[in-house]
Amino acid sequence: MKTPTPHNTAKYGDFAKTVLMPGDPLRARFIAENYLENARLVNNVRGINGWTGFYAGKRVSVMASGMGMPSIAIYAHELFDCYGVECIIRVGSAGAVADDVNLRDIVLAQAACTNSAFAASYRLPGDFAPIGDFGPVS
């Protein structure tokens, strides 16, 4: 595990085992400033800042992923493989077409997939839809 990386100035151990990951860097800052206690900036590269602090007594980090699959792939790969992160929770906003989903409702997605060639670059067959661990949200 070699840290820092080209995309992350943090040292090993700076990130918590659980990282909240919005796409927008300003949303990451908002989460750190409004929800984390004793938040400390651990990464500041290319406008993608990462913070580590405490939420309800649990050590948690938050870092933006930037826009698109290539960007989140880079950051997620480094967090898992270089920094020992165990759980990334993607947080953000989305549109809805269901009549019973209202503005500001919280929706927990069971899985997500894409019709891009991204999964093929990892030799995953077809439209791969990984299903997350329900432990962090139960």
Spans of model-derived segments:
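Metabolite-binding pocket within alpha/beta catalytic cores that recognizes anionic/polar moieties
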Residues: 1-138
